[in-house]
């Protein structure tokens, strides 16, 4: 069962970078009542993900971004606070995305060290292969990801809220925001998107 204190922890973690947003401000006006309601909804399995907003970013390439409501972001942080420490125990050291103490700068620094080592201090040729996964997020098979995460939680997570965490992970992963969202950008020509990376926006 999820308790108020752990939901409060997720709320405080969530608002660190979102406190100035309208959604965060509205939630904060009655945050105790709102957190109690959110906690009760999770425990009774009545929680449902709200409408996301969808907008287009143009740099470094055209892509759609879905942003959840503030209360849904609290749930995301609730999940992340439990899974991130476990992921850190199994991730390869060369995984740099979305990890504390890693990121782009750490990745570039490691790459420079690798090039220096492979080229024997820049005295020999060394080759670098740059690759990308086309339409990565759009092509994820949600059911397979949900099972992988559920198996991971069952094996590694030991908290009293294990069943709640399993339920929330499945709910969030299987959610399809493109079916219920508010558009915040004008339509964009399909040709501007990389192949496989459009779900909502297209000029009709």
Q: Predicted regions span which residues?
A:
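Non-catalytic, polymerase-adjacent accessory regions of viral genome-replication enzymes
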Residues: 1-36
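Active-site-proximal segment of RNA-dependent polymerases
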Residues: 80-142
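Short, compositionally biased low-complexity segments
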Residues: 2-16, 49-53, 80-86, 119, ...
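Conserved polymerase palm-domain catalytic core
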Residues: 41, 114, 118-204
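Active-site-flanking structural segment that lines cofactor/substrate pockets
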Residues: 33-62
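Conserved, non-catalytic sequence blocks in retroelement Pol enzymes and Pol-derived host proteins
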Residues: 27, 99-100, 157-161
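Conserved pre-motif C helix in the palm subdomain of viral-like polymerases
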Residues: 62-92, 137, 181-204
